[in-house]
Curated annotation (Swiss-Prot):
Native source organism of the sequence: Thermoplasma acidophilum (strain ATCC 25905 / DSM 1728 / JCM 9062 / NBRC 15155 / AMRC-C165)
UniProt-listed Pfam families: Ribosomal_S6e
GO BP field: translation
Keyword Translocase belongs to the record: no
Keywords attached to this entry: Ribonucleoprotein, Ribosomal protein
Family in the record: Belongs to the eukaryotic ribosomal protein eS6 family.
InterPro entries attached to this UniProt entry: Ribosomal_eS6, Ribosomal_eS6_arc
Protein name: Small ribosomal subunit protein eS6
Amino acid sequence: MAIIADPKTGKTYKKEIPAERMGSLVGRKIGDEIDGVFFDLVGYKLVVTGGSSIDGFPMRSDLQTQGKKQILVSYKKGYRGKNGIRKRITVRGSIIGSDISQINLKIVQYGPTPLEEKKDDQQA
């Protein structure tokens, strides 16, 4: 599943990714630009901003791996404890693998038709 954020309107849209297209996204990283044709959005350019795995672990942009890692974090992305307290949490790397169930995307270039006019989109 892809969650596409529209920065102009502040709305998000859900798109299901077919299995044959998901294989072409494997190996992309957080921050990579993807053509909107993957999601039937002709003319759009999207940037990967994150995601989560089948197990529910979030992707983290500073880990250059596909697998899970246990890292020690303080008050930052993935842990919101009190200041000075650190905790070991499990996160996914920044590379999209076959076990990623949700990909978060942001629109950076708009196409000729607005997302609101797409009939098969669902608002998240």
